[in-house]
């Protein structure tokens, strides 16, 4: 679960990480009032969305009058912000962060993340802040510094000192960096976070280290341990179907194509989408109904797909290991009766109780296209969507 910048900064500040003075605003009037409370002569108005690239997209604005604060708030609030990470539909701006500007002498990058390869929490840092870290890792991996935290000891201060001196910080700044890294580590443990990122970590003209932007990602699998996550969750940043899917325990991600996919198992779902693209189609979604999907769960999954008006055809690809094909067939029949099936549906069933499932579908009177094998199913789905 992603958090907004203003939420991430508040949580970091609770752990002693220095952040600029800033106040969130949820209306134009609030934006003006918060700017007056902070005092001038200048402010930074930041759109709050779960996506990077806000600056290049016009979502971060430097202003030097209250009138300009009001104008920026009017232009941003309630509108979609399209960045390189959002897709063409953009993300809805429901909040702003009104922040005092900082005099920046130098920028660093610092992030804590879970390194699954090493099964360790790892700090990733570079002398170049404000950059696209993925591009830097690909083009100049030697510029990245890694600090691996041993689970038996936790994060130790000497690790921050080593990093600070490598970056050419003075003794006072190294002490600040140590406190910042300790705070990030405490926050990650407290929230079960997969990532705590500060980009950039600024060194101001006065020599202070300051978290100018922050990102926190909580582990969805640990949210049950964090009732406070309900207050942090922002439904405006997710597709409505994704929110519904989450309520029913389905793994759903909306995409840009017109072929709806219902598959059991994440790996099989990705392979299905790959084959659709290989044969000239575009998947409308990733949808994993899980290993032991019951009829009601499949019913809800089918409704999710049918609620997407872009979908022109549906591909159901089930390998019945834990999932019984006859239960899935019951879910399809139930959903078709409730929603009304008006699109071509390609069905590929293999495995447990396949024959019983296919018999149920045949006896239902539904107009279905059966497929032998995954390649055949993908080709038929693409043809159905195109014609």
Swiss-Prot record:
The record's free-text note on cofactor binding: Binds 1 Mg(2+) ion per subunit.
Pathway entry: Carbohydrate metabolism; tricarboxylic acid cycle; succinate from succinyl-CoA (ligase route): step 1/1
Reaction(s) the record says it catalyses: succinate + ATP + CoA = succinyl-CoA + ADP + phosphate; GTP + succinate + CoA = succinyl-CoA + GDP + phosphate
Magnesium listed as a keyword: yes
Residue stretches making up the ATP-grasp domain: 9-244
Positions contributing to ATP binding: 46, 53-55, 99, 102, 107
Positions annotated to bind substrate: 264, 321-323
UniProt keyword annotations, A-Z: ATP-binding, Ligase, Magnesium, Metal-binding, Nucleotide-binding, Tricarboxylic acid cycle
Protein name per the record: Succinate--CoA ligase [ADP-forming] subunit beta
Organism per entry: Acidithiobacillus ferrooxidans (strain ATCC 23270 / DSM 14882 / CIP 104768 / NCIMB 8455)
